[in-house]
Amino acid sequence: MIQGSIVAIVTPMHADGALDLPGLRKLIDWHIAEGTDGIVIVGTTGESPTVSVDEHCELIRVAVEHTAKRIPIIAGTGGNSTSEAIELTQFAKDVGADASLQVVPYYNRPTQEGMYQHFKKIVEAVDLPAILYNVPGRTVADMSNETILRLAQIPSVIGVKDATGNISRGIDLMRLRPKDFAVYSGDDATAMALMLCGANGNISVTANIAPRGMHQLCDAAINQRVAEAIAINNKLVPLHNKLFIEPNPVPLKWAMAEIGLIPSGMRLPIVPLAAEYHDIVRAAMRESGVLQ
């Protein structure tokens, strides 16, 4: 089972929006050195909606090849087209990804039965472990615990990223899940609480800029070292809060560029962080110790 701090890694881009693949390789090496336990490539934070299919595949390929099995690579291959998700997932399997991340279909607003059939079709078509991804704040389609538990009966559906931020709902899911089905937080602000209640890790935005701290937090919380987890989380809280002052990944990319981790590029309709928030994010970085 994949567990711990799983970074939802950014896609480095130059000022003109071109992919920075050497920069991605450097980021991967840095994450491994800092203790990151796994990487989600081309997820929400990786700007999956604004990369082409060819770029999407290239990012997965580069991540898998460069990581070389040092840590697991989870390929973001989900979408609101079942057939396209199958094609991307097949590519991820072919190049050696360890698992796929399958987001609830967005915009077309499927029913619970539609969600079930969508995911079932993908995992039947491609023999690659799949992690479901429920993020109703972005998809406007909320997968119920009942549907998640129904899908959890399929052996290749190995877990869910719960980005609802609803701790009581997550606890109820964990109470009813099969023993080998993983639950990951997808919300940095509530991740510690969910892990202390039994979640297997955090698929994290904050880990992009504080990988060692997030690894330490996950290790402490998963292993029930409560006081240690609280102390680490308290240090990271300013980042949990201010990295979402505008929609992710805008504040995150600004913060990472500020300390030289990546260039400042992103793609429309995402635009750079408003100047009025620069000092606010910078202060959070200082408070959390990622900026001196």
Swiss-Prot record:
Protein's cellular compartments: Cytoplasm
Biological process terms in GO annotation: diaminopimelate biosynthetic process; lysine biosynthetic process via diaminopimelate
One term under GO cellular component: cytosol
Catalytic activity, EC: 4.3.3.7
Catalytic reaction list: L-aspartate 4-semialdehyde + pyruvate = (2S,4S)-4-hydroxy-2,3,4,5-tetrahydrodipicolinate + H2O + H(+)
Molecular function terms from GO: 4-hydroxy-tetrahydrodipicolinate synthase activity
Residue numbers binding pyruvate: 45, 203
HAMAP family: DapA
UniProt subunit comment: Homotetramer; dimer of dimers.
Record's function text: Catalyzes the condensation of (S)-aspartate-beta-semialdehyde [(S)-ASA] and pyruvate to 4-hydroxy-tetrahydrodipicolinate (HTPA).
Protein name, as recorded: 4-hydroxy-tetrahydrodipicolinate synthase
Native source organism of the sequence: Herminiimonas arsenicoxydans
